[in-house]
Structure formats: C-alpha cells, structure tokens
C-alpha cells in the first residue's frame, strides 16, 4: 500500500520556504518543488501510516478539474491497494461546478480506497450537493485552514507562513498557506480522521 495524494498548493507544500526568493511564486525550480512536496502534510501522514508516499500536489491556481485531469493522466500508475487522499481546492478555479468535479473524481476513483478533504474553502459552500455520495468526504463543511485557525486559538502558535495568524486584519481568507508546523498539524488532523476507517 502507498499513500497517493492529489491537491493544490496546500498539498504541494506552498508556504514552506524560508527564502524570500520563492515567496509569492507558485512555479519554483525542481529543487524547491521537491522540497515542498517532501515536507507537506502528506509526508507526515505517510510516516504515521508507515507506507511510501507519492505527493501529486500542484501550485499555480490548480483547481478541482485540474486534479481530476491529473488523476486521469496517472490512472495506470495507481495500484489497487493505494490509499488515495484528495484535498479539494477552491471550487471555482476552473469552468466547472463542484457537483460535476466531485462526481467525476469519485466516479474515476470508485474502485480505490479514497478519502476527500477540503484544503481551505468548503467545496459545497456556495452550491448544494446533488445526488452525491459523501461517505468518503471527511467533514465536507470544514477545511484544513479551519483546523489550523482553531488550533491557533488553543495554542497561540502560528501555523501559517510568515508567522502570521489566520484572520488578522489585512489577511484575506484563503490567502495564507501553512508553515512547517501547520503542515505537521494538518497531518495530525488527517491521520486522526483516517486511523479508524482505513
């Protein structure tokens, strides 16, 4: 079994760099891209599960339809016992709808052990789900960013890049990415949700 993850910048690891050279730039060189992917939340989930990892997270406004296309391009690489986790992006980055994106991804992966999370914006916040199976969607109205915000309130520790706290004046919702502690915190959330069901 392997952990295979798909998602946007929240899965890729955007926000990890300490270098001002890469802050605000979604398309780094290969070295920086590997650094991000190897230190984002999927790494720590895979370590907790004791299985290998393939992190397919992408930056540059990578939307849910883009996630679908990336999965489709790589179907031949997936193994029947892979654990697949999708962290959904902002639902309106592509010219598709949340209902269509969710159904297309769920149909594509119907024969796999898969689970869905929201990265920073609830996929169905602005649209009612129609005839969809949410049995594999973990907390459809909650996001990784919500979890980090709630954790910050309890610990008074910043889990976002540049040591910013979520929700401070001047910081727009969804405009922050996790720092290393934030990605580790997300991995705890994901692992705790999955450990009893997979």
Could you say what each language-model-derived stretch is?
Residues 1-63, 76, 178, 185:
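Serine-esterase "nucleophile elbow" of acetyl-processing enzymes
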Residues 66:
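Glycine-rich anion/phosphate-binding loops
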Residues 71-198:
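Alpha-helical cap/lid subdomain in secreted, periplasmic
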């Amino acid at each position: 079994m392997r952990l295979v993850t798909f998602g946007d910048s929240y899965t890729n690891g955007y926000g990890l760099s300490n270098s001002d050279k890469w802050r605000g730039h979604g398309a780094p060189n290969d070295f920086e891209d590997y650094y991000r992917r190897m230190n984002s939340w999927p790494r720590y989930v895979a370590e907790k599960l004791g299985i290998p990892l393939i992190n397919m997270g992408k930056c540059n406004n990578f939307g849910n339809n883009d996630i679908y296309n990336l999965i489709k391009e790589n179907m031949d690489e997936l193994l029947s016992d892979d654990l697949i986790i999708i962290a959904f992006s902002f639902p309106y980055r592509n010219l598709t709808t949340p209902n269509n994106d969710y159904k297309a991804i769920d149909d594509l992966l119907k024969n796999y052990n898969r689970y869905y999370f929201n990265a920073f914006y609830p996929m169905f916040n602005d649209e009612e789900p129609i005839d969809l199976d949410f049995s594999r969607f973990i907390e459809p109205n909650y996001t990784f960013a919500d979890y980090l915000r709630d954790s910050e309130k309890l610990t008074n520790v910043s889990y976002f890049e540049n040591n910013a706290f979520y929700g401070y004046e001047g910081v727009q919702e969804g405009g922050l990415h996790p720092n290393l502690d934030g990605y580790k915190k997300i991995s705890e959330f994901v692992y705790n949700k999955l450990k009893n069901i997979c």
